[in-house]
UniProtKB/Swiss-Prot annotation:
Protein name per Swiss-Prot or TrEMBL: Large ribosomal subunit protein uL1
Assigned keywords, A-Z: Repressor, Ribonucleoprotein, Ribosomal protein, RNA-binding, rRNA-binding, Translation regulation, tRNA-binding
GO biological process: regulation of translation; translation
GO cellular component, one term: cytosolic large ribosomal subunit
One Pfam family of this chain: Ribosomal_L1
UniProt xrefs under InterPro entries: Ribosom_uL1_bac-type, Ribosomal_uL1, Ribosomal_uL1-like, Ribosomal_uL1/biogenesis, Ribosomal_uL1_3-a/b-sand, Ribosomal_uL1_CS
Length: 234
């Protein structure tokens, strides 16, 4: 068995794995234990009461966090004409059609989000093997295939997160940075949970949001007591 580092020993001593913490206490604990030499992200894992083997119970979507994620996001947009000008005005770093596709085929992938207008999907479709494995393929379910590319660019820049359950029915995403004010992290978490509730599949039975845990990039998960969250979540 690998020897625990001093940092991991401290984390294990501080975090009770059997306890559900009040959200304010959980955030304070994360901040106390975030001792990495960079500003760690605050990540969340939400266990959903779904059968992930059934396609009609899978949960996928996007929402804009009220306080963003703390990340600067580079956006590439496939579109043309007036939409291209609107995308540039909204802040997109890369805008084009076949020319942009050619850049990507050459391995130039200097972006975090790809957005496309419906008429551009004939071009984007050629890039499935490149964009798909990286989770960058535009999809109408998360608002990245849309006639209103300017709004999609603004959402991406404003801190939109995309979520999708894994094979175990768990959503993994980020809700900000550990140096955010505690209230902002709490409000971001609540916004995510509200979005997940709205995305609940009609076929899902029983308790839907079963467990919520937050962690930092280099830290342990801290289970959150949902009773301490706003009424809109519960």
């Amino acid at each position: 068995m690998a020897k625990l580092t001093k940092r991991m020993r401290v984390i294990r001593e501080k975090v009770d794995a059997t306890k559900q913490y009040d959200i304010n206490e959980a955030i304070a604990l994360l901040k106390e234990l975030a001792t990495a030499k960079f500003v760690e992200s605050v990540d969340v894992a939400v266990n959903l009461g779904i059968d992930a083997r059934k396609s009609d119970q899978n949960v996928r979507g996007a929402t804009v966090l009220p306080h963003g994620t703390g990340r600067s996001v580079r956006v590439a947009v496939f579109t043309q004409g007036a939409n291209a000008e609107a995308a540039k005005a909204a802040g997109a770093e890369l805008v084009g059609m076949e020319d942009l596709a050619d850049q990507i085929k050459k391995g130039e992938m200097n972006f975090d989000v790809v957005i496309a207008s419906p008429d551009a999907m004939r071009v984007v479709g050629q890039l499935g093997q490149v964009l798909g494995p990286r989770g960058l393929m535009p999809n109408p379910k998360v608002g990245t295939v849309t006639p209103n590319v300017a709004e999609a660019v603004k959402n991406a820049k404003a801190g939109q997160i995309r979520y999708r359950n894994d094979k175990n029915g768990i959503i993994h995403t980020t809700i900000g940075k550990v140096d955010f004010d505690a209230d902002k992290l709490k409000e971001n978490l609540e916004a995510l949970l509200v979005a997940l509730k709205k995305a609940k599949p009609t076929q899902a039975k029983g308790v839907y949001i079963k467990k919520v845990s937050i962690s930092t990039t280099m830290g342990a998960g801290v289970a959150v007591d949902q009773a301490g969250l706003s009424a809109s979540v519960n």
